[in-house]
């Protein structure tokens, strides 16, 4: 019933991580109102996990899109970066709102779960790319950063001393709903020890209206090892 939850919350833009090609094809069939950008991280085609970025067809026109790898050679498909255990990448889209005519830049990523340098250097590269590609448009960045809010990685992303910094939507939202964590490993971690590692960041004038971590389960079943993060922006 995961597609029912997606329909219920009705997000205009949706960032997904760890999506395999067969799952992507299943989701395309079940979510016909969305188009998607992204490639498999292992070959830049359909091998390995996608950091797929979905957007509502009725709401947005796709102006441009692309992918890069979080590595010393970001344009080389399947490249591993620094001390990373896995190939890591980001997929992005420049979207035009059919209602307002405004343009938005959206990016979705998934940082390494092992490599400390890979996370730190990966977010530095990401900030550079967002600055380069967004063209001053309002920015929405979604992803599993495998790093807690107090970590050097997230502090680097949100460092106001860096003109390329992003703002954590949770920190500026007037409404914050749900737990202070997002990763529960299918309920195997005591809730008081669960970390917040999934984020929505904004930049360039976006106002955050509400933020929530959707931690409900389907009976005793978890839909994922992470709880979705939902943010409303204006």
Task: Give a label for each model feature.
Residues 2-27, 54, 93, 103-109, ...:
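Active-site beta-strand/loop signature of hydrolases that rely on acidic residues for catalysis
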Residues 7-8, 29, 44-47, 83-87, ...:
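Extracellular/periplasmic catalytic domains that process cell-envelope and extracellular macromolecules
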Residues 109-113, 117-122, 126:
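Hydrophobic, aromatic-enriched interface-forming segments
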Residues 66-74, 110-113, 173-174, 213-219:
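Short, solvent-exposed aromatic-acidic interface loops
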Residues 41-45, 112-114, 146-147:
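Short histidine/acidic/glycine/proline-rich micro-motifs that form metal-
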């Amino acid at each position: 019933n995961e597609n029912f939850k997606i329909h219920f919350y009705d997000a205009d833009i949706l960032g997904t991580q760890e999506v395999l090609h067969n799952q992507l094809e299943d989701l395309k069939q079940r979510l016909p109102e969305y188009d998607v950008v992204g490639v498999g991280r292992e070959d830049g085609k359909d091998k390995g996990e996608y950091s797929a970025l979905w957007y509502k067809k009725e709401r947005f026109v796709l102006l441009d899109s692309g992918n890069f790898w979080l590595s010393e050679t970001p344009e080389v498909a399947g490249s591993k970066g620094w001390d990373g255990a896995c190939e890591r990448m980001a997929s992005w889209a420049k979207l035009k709102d059919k209602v307002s005519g405004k343009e938005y830049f959206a990016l979705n990523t998934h940082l390494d779960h092992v490599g400390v340098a890979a996370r730190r250097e990966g977010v530095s590269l990401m900030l550079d790319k967002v600055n380069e590609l967004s063209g001053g448009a309002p920015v929405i960045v979604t992803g599993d950063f495998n790093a807690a809010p107090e970590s050097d990685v997230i502090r680097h992303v949100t460092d106001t001393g860096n003109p390329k910094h992003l703002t954590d939507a949770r920190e500026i939202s007037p409404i914050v709903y749900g737990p202070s964590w997002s990763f529960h490993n299918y309920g195997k971690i005591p809730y008081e020890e669960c970390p917040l590692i999934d984020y929505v960041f904004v930049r360039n004038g976006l106002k955050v209206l509400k933020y929530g971590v959707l931690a409900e389960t389907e009976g005793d079943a978890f839909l994922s090892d992470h709880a979705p993060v939902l943010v409303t922006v204006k």
